[in-house]
Amino acid sequence: YKSTEIKSIKYYDSKSKEWIKFVPLMAQKSLPSVWNKNPKPYKTPIFLKPVYEGKNVSAYIHYISTITNTKTLHLEGTNYVFYFKVKNEDVAKGYWMGSSIGAKMLLKIVFKPYPVMKETVSNLDTKEFYKDPISLIRTFDSLLK
C-alpha cells in the first residue's frame, strides 16, 4: 500500500497484545533548528502513531531507525520523533526527539508561530517535559481557541 491510498494501518503487537494504529500524514522531514526554522515536509505522507487527540491539536510519534557504517564501525539505533498537528494546518510539525540538550531552545523555535505558547515554553519544567512530552501538547490544545 502507498501512504496516499489508505486512511490508516493497524498491526497486532504480540508483546503488548494490542492493535497499534498508524495514520498517514504530511510531516516535516526534520526538527526545526536555528538554521532551518521551518523544515520542508516529506514528499508523501508518512505513517505516524496517534498518541493524543485534542479539540485543536493532535500528537503523534514517528518511529525511526538509523544505520551508520564506516570502515571500522557499524552503529544501529532506533528512536522516535514527537509531532503535533494543529487542526487547520496541513503538515505535522516535529517538536522533540528525546534529547535533553537544548530542548527549551528547540521548543522556543517550534512554538514561535504560536504566541499563546510563549509563556508556557519559557516556564517549562524540562524534567517533567522529558517524563511526558505529550503533556506540552495537551497544554497547547487547552490554550488554543
Can you say where each PLM-predicted feature lies in the sequence?
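C-terminal partner/receptor-binding element of secreted or periplasmic proteins
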Residues: 114-145
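Aromatic-patch recognition
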Residues: 1-120
